[in-house]
């Protein structure tokens, strides 16, 4: 009988750390280096295959978490990347830029608070000036702050910050970037399981993620005749600095997932790469659910 080489299979249940995690508390926006366990962005594992060769990408919130993993994956697939961060995230952004350049691609880190329309417009102008245009727009930056004490604990200041960061910024950036995006370009938004199964302590955040789903569906139909696709990724629990910085108890984070653990940022990036690539040429208006088994519509 012919011999067959045994395929190497990876058990997703035990692939990455599982809760309980050590107690940890950070001030917003949190630090990757201070997390235990440290998030995996694919530094040692992601291998590119030229799927995005020569593409020009603009990614918001690229300093850490999912954003860093996406920037790394895009670069290793051949894209040049402009990404945003807040002033207090400069050290994190420097590491993301290093990973992009290590892949042999252009990295431009831009301080930008997307709650302000003028900064969004300036960001797009900066990206076009640095890269010559925009082929990929990833609206990933977001803000959340858990309020287990109910709606009364959500201040107008917090509500406004969540809305401006998660919705207004996405709207302004998409509107400005489209003037520089050719046929074949792609918009990818970061939605969330919270948009479908909202947690009571993330009321305002969940509202915005549900809105992102509707925005993506409408935008895809609007842009189809221009040859530009629009999709979103809806992650489940992902181990990023936002968790110890915004959640009251991160020790059990992700245990409710059918896989029994949170995702690592590196596990989200391939979905963005696929949607950005020509392999998804007939896919638009879709929400790719990456929840570890939690069923969504």
Question: Positions of the model-derived regions?
Answer:
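Short C-terminal tail/terminal secondary-structure segment
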Residues: 3-8, 35, 43-44, 148, ...
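Conserved mid-core segment of classical short-chain dehydrogenase/reductases
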Residues: 14, 116, 121, 142-160, ...
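Conserved glycine-rich Rossmann-like NAD(P)H-binding loop of the short-chain dehydrogenase/reductase
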Residues: 79-95
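Catalytic Tyr-X3-Lys loop
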Residues: 152-171, 184, 188, 212, ...
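A glycine/serine/threonine-rich, flexible loop-to-helix segment
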Residues: 153, 201-203, 225, 232-258, ...
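Alpha-helical segment proximal to the catalytic Tyr-Lys
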Residues: 179-180, 221-225, 281
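Residue(s) in the substrate-gating loop at a strand-loop-helix junction
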Residues: 192
């Amino acid at each position: 009988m012919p011999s067959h080489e045994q395929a190497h299979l990876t058990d997703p249940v035990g692939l990455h750390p599982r809760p309980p995690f050590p107690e940890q508390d950070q001030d917003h926006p949190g630090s990757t280096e201070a997390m235990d366990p440290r998030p995996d962005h694919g530094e040692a594992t992601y291998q590119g295959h030229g799927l995005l060769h020569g593409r020009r990408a603009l990614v918001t919130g690229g300093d850490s978490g999912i954003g860093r993993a996406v920037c790394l994956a895009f670069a290793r697939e051949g894209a040049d990347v402009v990404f945003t961060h807040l002033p207090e995230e400069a050290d994190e952004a420097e590491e993301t830029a290093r990973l992009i350049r290590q892949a042999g691609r252009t990295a431009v880190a831009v301080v930008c608070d997307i709650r302000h329309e003028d900064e969004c417009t300036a960001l797009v102008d900066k990206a076009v000036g640095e890269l010559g245009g925009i082929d990929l727009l990833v609206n990933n930056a977001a803000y959340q702050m858990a309020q287990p004490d109910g709606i009364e604990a959500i201040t107008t200041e917090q509500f406004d910050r969540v809305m401006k960061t998660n919705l207004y910024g996405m709207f302004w950036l998409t509107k400005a970037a489209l003037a520089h995006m050719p046929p074949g370009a792609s918009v990818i938004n970061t939605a969330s399981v919270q948009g479908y199964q909202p947690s009571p302590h993330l009321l305002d955040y969940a509202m915005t993620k549900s809105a992102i789903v509707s925005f993506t569906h409408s935008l895809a139909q609007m842009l189809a005749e221009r040859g530009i696709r629009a999709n979103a990724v809806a992650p489940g629990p992902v181990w990023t600095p936002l968790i110890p910085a915004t959640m009251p108890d991160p020790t059990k984070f992700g245990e409710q997932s059918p896989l029994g653990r949170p995702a690592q940022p590196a596990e989200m990036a391939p979905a963005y790469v696929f949607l950005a690539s020509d392999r998804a040429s007939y896919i638009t208006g879709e929400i790719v659910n990456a929840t570890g088994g939690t069923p969504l519509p």
